[in-house]
Regions:
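Short, small-residue-biased leader/transition segments that mark boundaries at the very start
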Residues: 1-6
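Terminal targeting signals and extreme-terminal segments of soluble enzymes
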Residues: 7-83, 89-145
Length: 145
């Protein structure tokens, strides 16, 4: 069922907070979480082949972020380890939608949550209102409804 598909299209990738990512309060600077989400998308694209940035580019498209939501729950500090869970959210629209949960690797507590939406632009920079063929094929391959 759809619940199985939803559970199946999840990537988990680990990270360790680097010194360069913290601010003067010794916690991860808020903007770094956007990069952690990107790390999650990249890992997702490697696991679910065909939806990585280079796959999209090779198909003649770009997929810029047009919406990003981020909610901070608990700070991370230098050398903390965390797990970024990236979930693909199926949609009929010509968009790529993800939800993210970042958890502390030590206690499993949620440190941040969010979502992103990407659209498709062709080589001329034109917004695609219909899903590109490579995206439709990717959905078929991974049994996305």
């Amino acid at each position: 069922g759809l619940g199985d598909v939803y559970k199946r299209q999840v990537n988990k990738t680990s990270l360790r907070v680097r010194f360069s990512e913290v601010d003067s309060m010794q916690i991860v600077w808020h903007g770094e979480y956007v990069r952690y989400f990107e790390d999650g998308r990249e890992a997702f694209g490697r696991e679910f082949a065909g939806l990585g940035y280079m796959d999209i580019h090779a198909s003649g498209y770009t997929a810029p972020i047009v919406e990003l939501q981020l909610q901070y729950k608990k700070p991370l500090r230098v050398n903390d380890t965390a797990v970024v869970e990236t979930r693909y959210i199926a949609t009929e629209a010509a968009k790529i939608c993800f939800e993210y949960t970042i958890r502390s690797a030590t206690d499993g507590e949620i440190v941040a949550e969010g979502s992103s939406t990407q659209v498709f632009l062709d080589a001329r920079g034109e917004l695609q209102l219909l899903a590109p063929e490579f995206y439709r094929k990717w959905k078929e391959r991974w049994d996305v409804k």
